[in-house]
Amino acid sequence: MVRRRGPTPPPSPPREERPIVPQPAIDLEEGEGQVQPPAPVRLEIIGVGEEEEIVELEELVQGGVDDEVAGGEEVEGGEEEAEAPILGPQERRVRGVAAGERGELADRLDPEVPGPQPGPLLRDASGWSDIDQLGAWQCALNPFTTMESVPGPLKSKWARVMEIVLRAILTAPDEIRLTRALKWFLILPQAFLRQSKRGGQVGRSSVAGRFNAAMDGDFGTVIRLLMADRQKDEETRRREAGRTRRQKSEEEIKEGQRKLALSHLQKGEISKAVSRLTSFGMASIDDPVVMAALKSKYVARGKELPESVIMGQAVDFLGGLKETFASLPTGVSPGTGGLRAEYLTCLAEVWEDGTMAILEEFSMLYISGNLPPWWYRVWGCVTTVPLYKTVEMATVRPVGIKNPLIRTLHSRVIRDNRAALTAVLEPQQLALSLAGGHKLVHQVRMMMEEHRDWVVVKLDVRNAHNEVWRSAIIKALEADPTTQHLAWFAAVILAACSGLETGGKMWGEQGDGETQGDPKAPAFFAMAIQAIVRILDAELRAGGGKARFGNDDGYCGGPPEVVFPALARFETKLREECGLVLQRDKTEVFAWGELPEITPPELKRAGVMVQGRTI
């Protein structure tokens, strides 16, 4: 802030704006791929008693010009006392736990999510507070398709807008302004980078116009344009609701798959191309049968979480996010809100290390559980996609998608703690082990070939990741001294029920379980069942056998008279302590000869018999 002091001037009007040179809409075809310098921020002269202040845009958005004028108090020397940020700096930066320190979960289980501000809006000059007309869920749920990447000429402006919002979060002096800034963070992708309904120059200019308004300090126009597009989108949906859509032919579906696969191949994304070609397609949530199947996959909370959890720091620091963002995979679904990985890569391209530190600080607040409880409920909302399991299209499996920033942060937590987690899980659980899949295959095969009189049972746990009790995850992390520092991170992320949405519409909640595709899910699931797996392994080893798991895929080998009783006890403990159900009708038994007489009748034989041999 720049101050101009001097003799007492005559009374002046409350505010006088300096003239602004209007910026023309940017033609995205010109300078494509180039990073343009950020547009100059708007300055305003504000009369405050005996002096005038030149206020930058960042200060204006901290709650509006009126707050800026009236919010400060004069202290000795005539300077205003800066209001302390409500979030404050992080107190602990080193992984570990503080002796005897526990965090309460009561206010995190069902936090009240901020809604639209009731009554007339208190508008400010920048329009920053216009977002008060929207609730947090309205900001998070995105009915639009966002652009695949940030257009070259707009990269610096996207980075600038993101920086303004993050600074507003970190410096917010009260709950009202913190909530306002967090809602801006939620709505940024759809507010600025939603695809225009019109193509060509008109469409490109409309996108550029949103950024130009923000660079002119006019965030109110950004909200106004968004609300107008939302209204048009709703009207279009209502008109099309009663229409019968033409069903695509099988050849049209295959042609679409080939085009998508080819686009991935052109980018060098071979695995994505293969998955497109082998996919059986996506089911429609408008089909009542599909929706019923989808809802059955997400369960209500089966066991209450503990009242308090050991406080700990999951990671030491988050330095290096810039390099991580620069190498994020492209073409990945953005999840709830429309924030694509390409938008984060843009930040890595534009921001200097000092600016990236702002996002690192925000991310540390998230991981440490220092953001408002409602934030974890809203930001952690899961986009659900029902995919057909087979070519018959008779059954579906749900795929849950979280936004790429959450996935990146959760991946960092697991990466930094992989050694500690692996030490707890091995040798029974190989999900996090180096070349764990190879180790699992070789150990099971060697066990089968070495002991021709044994049986090997392949376990099938129903809907494992979606049904495991969250309380079991937290309990397991707290139980081991080497993983206690992760318990608080798990608790704040999992305390509130997770929202489930598709196409910007909420359709349900998930009270227990993890999200498949979330980088923390395999590790947390493995920890939840590890104590029971150890008991199973110990019972089998008493008879010479062993138990080995690759996450929820388990294999038990040993003499039949040892394996089957141990399996029954494992099944009971799994249900009582983790809320998981062993599907006996899908659990298979391998034996070189005939199945032993003591084999439970509901367990089926693995493999097939050909000329007296099992293959």
What do these predicted regions represent?
Residues 413-429, 523-566:
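Active-site palm subdomain of RNA-directed nucleic acid polymerases
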Residues 375-377, 546-549, 581-584:
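Short beta-strand
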Residues 463-481, 547-577, 592-595:
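Catalytic palm subdomain of template-directed nucleic-acid polymerases
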Residues 6-12, 21:
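Phospho-regulated RS/SR low-complexity segments
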Residues 248, 307, 311-528:
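Conserved pre-catalytic core of RNA-dependent polymerases
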Residues 15, 21, 27-31, 41, ...:
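Surface-exposed loop/turn segments and immediately adjacent short secondary-structure elements
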Residues 583-614:
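Short, conserved micro-motifs composed of acidic
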Residues 354-369, 440-448, 563-579, 602-611:
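Inter-domain linker/hinge segments that demarcate the starts of reverse transcriptase
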